[in-house]
Regions:
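Conserved adenylation A10 loop of the ANL superfamily
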Residues: 2-17
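Conserved structural elements of the adenylate-forming
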Residues: 16-40
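Residue-level signal for inorganic ion chemistry
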Residues: 5, 62, 108
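Active-site glycine/GP-rich loop and adjacent strand/helix microenvironment
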Residues: 44-46, 59, 68-173
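Conserved AMP-binding loop of ANL adenylate-forming enzymes
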Residues: 34-71
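Short, conserved acidic/polar surface loops in the N-terminal third of protein domains
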Residues: 13-19, 36, 58-61, 119-121
Length: 173
């Protein structure tokens, strides 16, 4: 596999490359710390990925990371809520509604820009959710292609107000 950087540092003209002849070591180096630091209290959790998955972007280590998280730690109802058109808002809303009605903790995973698009959509439709205790947000950073100027603190405040997930359950990778 060849993982490539986005190239934004050089205006998209140069993309760094990271070669992996075998992904077995890469996968283990992802799974073991993920379980230890993100999932120490449970084997599985329902996961909603709000960024591209591995099948959409095979040159992205982040896309592989998110896909592996669902494979190794996702429970029934987990999935990727992003396609070639962007966020699948109707499916995300259904996921969040189910999480609230089931009262089970869930985890959202994605880049910061996806969280902003989700927040904007939820605000526009006057939607808030009270996700179960121990729900968590996994933010991988990256405000690329966002039109809204916001700090990480402001985003975390909005996420807590909109989804009911306290800051201490938000991880930034």
């Amino acid at each position: 596999a060849v993982f490539m950087t986005s190239g934004t540092t050089h205006g998209g003209k140069m993309r760094g490359r990271n070669f992996h002849p075998d992904l077995e070591v890469w996968d283990e180096s992802m799974i073991v710390p993920f379980r230890h630091f993100i999932m120490p209290d449970r084997e599985r959790i329902r996961i909603a990925v709000i960024s591209p998955a591995w099948d959409m972007n095979q040159n992205s280590s982040l896309s592989r990371y998110l896909t592996k998280a669902v494979e190794c730690c996702g429970s029934e109802g987990s999935g990727v809520f992003f396609d070639e058109h962007g966020l699948k808002f109707d499916e995300i809303i259904a996921f969040l509604n189910r999480a609230v009605s089931d009262g089970e903790p869930v985890m959202l995973m994605g880049v910061s820009s996806s969280y902003l698009y989700l927040l904007d959509y939820l605000h526009e439709h006057d939607l808030t959710f009270a996700l179960a205790p121990d729900s968590r947000l996994f933010d991988t950073g990256g405000f690329k292609s966002t039109k809204r100027d916001i700090t990480e603190d402001q985003m975390l405040d909005e996420l807590e107000q909109t989804l009911g997930v306290p800051r201490h359950h938000c991880v930034n990778m």
